Amino acid sequence: MRILNHLILPILLLPALAQCQRNNGEGDFVKNNYDKQEVYIPMRDGIRLYTVIYAPKDKTTPHPVLMERTPYGSGPYGDSIYRRSLGPNRTLMHELYIFVYQDVRGRYMSEGQFQEMTPARNDPHNANKKPDASGKQTDESSDAWDTIDWLVRNVKGNNGRVGIYGISYPGFFASASLPDAHPALKCVSPQAPVTDEFIGDDANHNGAFFLLDNFDFDNFFDIPRPTPVKNYSGHLFHADYNDAYQFFLDLGPLKNANNPGYFNNKGKIWNEYMAGSTYTGYWEARNIRPHLKNVRPATLIVGGWFDAEDMFGSLRTYEAIEQQTPNNDNHIIMGPWTHGGWAGGNWTRFGILDFGQNVNDYYHQVETAFYNHYLLPTDSAGLPEAMIFETGTNKWKTYDTWPPKEATPLKLLLQPNSRLTSPSTASAYTPPSPETTASPGYDEYVSDPAHPVPYIDGIHSGRDNQYIVTDQRFAAQRSDVRAYQTGPLSADLTVTGRLRPDIWLSTTGSDADLIVKLIDVYPDTGSNPGYQRLVRAEVFRCKFRNSYEKPEALIPGQPAEIAFNMNEIAHCFRKGHRIMVQLQSSWFPLVDLNPQTFVNIPTANASDFQKATIRIWHDAAHPSGITLPVMQ
């Protein structure tokens, strides 16, 4: 989606602003070289979508069409007011594509009613323009089909070849163009696409609600739009806070967000989210992945290792196309970017991490080759299947498959005395204060909803996206966080692929959250001494351990196996570093509080929130650990 907070620019503005900044020296290039036209394109049900077309003045050769469909506005509006830059990068703008921007149904200047991630119909349905069995005529696939059909028939000087791209929410609309695609649609690039909002994107991760992001985002995105408008203004309510942790702690149970002064039941999408506390038909209908089969356009999936919103969407969209359309020309590129960071001109560092290069230079070469090959067309783009930036070494790697087949599983087991069984490349680990008594086969901590573990150290007024790489020493010092680590590695260890924790947990309550963090611990000497660099983290709401559709209470005192997949990494743990796993049961206010009782969290009362003693088991009967895909 999708994020708006008090510290960073809204993602919906990043591509335009970044391109504007890098094109400041080009003056009026767009106005001097393009004609602008604003039209309403009719859809099959009579609804008209507002569309802006920038066509090259040069008519000596036909030009391809590259389009973005967006809920964030296709402005600036007005025939005489031009964008300062066009398309996904400067090179393509200078190659004189026809660039098209469209307000999706029900947003800004388009007609119709907006739906959150419009559910896809059963394809094929586009060419015959007939309703499906339910009588429904349209979805985002049909709107893309009708738009493309109009463009190739009506825009003078086009070469009959169309591409679609989009970042974040526009990435969803790019993905939605793939089922039963128009024959003129030759390539699509879903970039950080919103894909499945219950399992891993934006709204929820494994059933746990991402409170901080959605509270801020829905506050502006949920503003009603009864008629077409050129500008949305304001918010549903005013919430000006300097300390997000304290603000949401004071807010109390999740249902209080609908109190007067906040959403007050005026947020349509917020209320839909609150009604969908399990993987109901609402969420399933908005999962685009089952529809990504028989894909005909070539695809370039783009994502960032530090994307706090939709990393899941990038990785799982690529995976869905590979599994359901194995012969499609499908590519993926993953770099050290935050959400949409590849759209700018310069990306050399993030937080304290210095990449030693502008990684966007490589990406823009890949992106340009992809579009030129399928839309001009040119000779083979020569793109590898997977182009992956390896953190730790700061190197681009290419693979024939993703994840690479060369990776082999290595399971690291939790041990007494805060130990993590060491790979062969690690020396034995001696804990700072070895226990002298026999291990009971578990470690335990008290999880208190009144004092949850913060997702990041310090005071922050909004979600700080650097939490995804931040130093975890602040958490390791807490009594409600358990940390396990190897000894120093005697050689580099490269982990490339998907992580799978398998943790045996028991509680005195009847529900719990489990947050698993994989951490690269730097040596005590050298640069960033002792830095506990977060490599990957994920939350799992334990009542969904057997089913997202039918949650089950935990039985107090009885160990339950919590096994799930985390997003991939491509990271080299360097010689002399340690591998650490941290476990905890809150991640606040990034994730809403689990009452630790088996209740419907969106309607839970303050009395439902209880302290619980969490035990992490690691005996022979309960071998807790995490499996890493290691490159040989």
Language-model segments: what does each one mean?
Residues 239, 246-255, 349-632:
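C-terminal, loop-rich substrate-recognition/catalytic regions characterized by aromatic stacking residues
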Residues 25-59, 485, 489-491:
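N-terminal cap/lid segment of alpha/beta-hydrolase-fold proteins
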Residues 82-85, 94, 116-130, 134-137, ...:
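Accessory cap/linker subdomain of secreted extracellular hydrolases
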Residues 60-153, 343-355, 478, 510, ...:
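Cap/lid segment of the alpha/beta-hydrolase catalytic domain
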Residues 295, 301-303:
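Short beta-strand/loop motif that positions the catalytic acidic residue
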